[in-house]
Regions:
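Conserved beta-strand signature within the Rossmann-like core of class I S-adenosyl-L-methionine
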Residues: 177-184
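Helix-to-beta-strand junctions that scaffold the AdoMet/dcAdoMet cofactor pocket
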Residues: 173-174
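N-terminal auxiliary segments of SAM/dcSAM-dependent transferases
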Residues: 1-49
Length: 274
């Protein structure tokens, strides 16, 4: 059965068998027991273990499973539902541990649609966690800058907090298809930042036009969450870039908290390929 994936070596279609993906040229990629394939050639890795590690994967899964970001998930589901035909092809690029990918897939199926979805991430531990969530999605370890996808293959591309690979997104998205780019809003985790830093500053908010895409809308998502225990606070901290660049004193202040109430703020930028 022909899959959504293309061979990362020669670009030919990959057929999915019971245990491996294979292309007509004979290149073969085993399917791990969790259900994902490794489609990241050595020349695209740039490090021995690219992307987030196993601890980061566990922190994300634990935090997101408690519903703290469900408002963002539900808003994404509504937007993608309104943009989708009966059998949409959707790629979640830099999908992380698959929280949004799986939620969107299940929403579309529940609405009577027949989505074909792929989730890719450069981190093997993160992708392994994602593949356990939903067997109906095609999962692969792959670079966002070298997607194992055919030209014009996707109706919708989703990028949540991952690096932009605009040239590749233009290649993979069909004309008229939609690209959803999720970024933190100005006040995202403001109260967390007040604990970590002496002089926190809001995230920049701007509309950036991208060549080959028309801006369609920006959807704001705003909420306040309360983390009732240090374990959840630490899990959230691990999910953020602040985990790697916070002064020791700020990290110690956060570790001393027994609870934290903080704003969450997101922007969903919606583009359409020209």
């Amino acid at each position: 059965m022909e899959s959504l994936f293309r061979c990362p070596v020669c670009g030919a279609p990959l057929d999915r068998g019971d245990r491996a993906y294979r292309c007509p040229a004979g290149h073969s990629y085993d399917i791990a027991r969790e259900g994902y394939a490794y489609l990241l050639p050595p020349n695209q890795k740039h490090s021995a273990a690219p992307g987030d590690d196993r601890d980061m994967a566990a922190a994300r899964r634990e935090f997101l499973s408690k519903g703290y970001y469900d408002l963002l998930l539900n808003t994404l589901c509504c937007q993608i539902l309104s943009l989708s035909g009966e059998s949409p092809v959707i790629w979640d690029v830099g999908c992380g541990e698959g929280f949004y990918t799986s939620g969107i897939f299940r929403t579309l199926v529940a609405a009577g649609k027949s989505p074909r979805m792929a989730g890719t991430d450069i981190s093997k531990p993160i992708l392994r966690s994602a593949a356990k969530r939903e067997k109906g999605i095609a999962w692969a370890v792959a670079s966002s800058f070298h997607l194992p996808a055919a030209d014009g293959a996707a109706d919708i591309l989703l990028d949540c907090f991952s690096p932009l690979a605009l040239e590749e997104f233009r290649r993979v998205l069909r004309p008229g298809g939609h690209f959803l780019y999720v970024v933190p809003g100005p006040d995202h985790l403001w109260e967390l930042k007040q604990v970590l830093y002496d002089r926190p500053y809001p995230n920049e908010e701007k509309e950036t036009p991208y060549e080959g895409f028309a801006y369609r809308s920006i959807v704001p998502v705003e909420d306040t969450i309360t983390l009732p225990c240090q374990a959840d606070i630490h899990a959230l901290f691990q999910m953020t870039p602040y985990y790697w660049k916070t002064p020791k004193a700020g990290a110690e202040r956060l570790a001393a908290l027994e609870s934290l109430t903080t704003r969450i703020s997101f922007r969903i930028h919606i583009f359409q390929k020209l």
